[in-house]
Amino acid sequence: MAILGNKTNEVQSAAQKVKVKTTTTTIVAENHPSRNGLSIVNTGSQNVWLGFGKAAVENEGALLTPGGSWNGMHGPMLWTGSVMGIAPAGETSVTVTEV
């Protein structure tokens, strides 16, 4: 069981390692309207740019530096749409966990 705020939810799936490519946008997390939690951690050695509901583009969206993470929140709201990623400097990986 994973704890999210005051809620206890079953983790939807084990943490998934996703390879993020350099020239094409990779789907990091699918659109999931009933998502209760999301964590994306850059476990690779290259920067990753995240696009929300659209293709990821360098210098737009959110930047995850190596070792950086994003908790799925936009202000007070949990993002339930798709998350795309691109790593312009070289292929790298992120770990994604959804609740």
Task: Annotate each language-model stretch with its function.
Residues 20, 58, 64-65:
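Short, charged recognition helix plus adjacent turn
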Residues 36-38, 75-91:
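Noncatalytic modules at the cell exterior or secretory-pathway interfaces
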Residues 12-33:
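Surface-exposed ligand/attachment interfaces on beta-rich extracellular proteins
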Residues 30, 65-79:
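Beta-sandwich interaction modules
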Residues 40, 50, 83, 94-96:
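Hydrophobic beta-strand residues in large extracellular and virion-surface proteins
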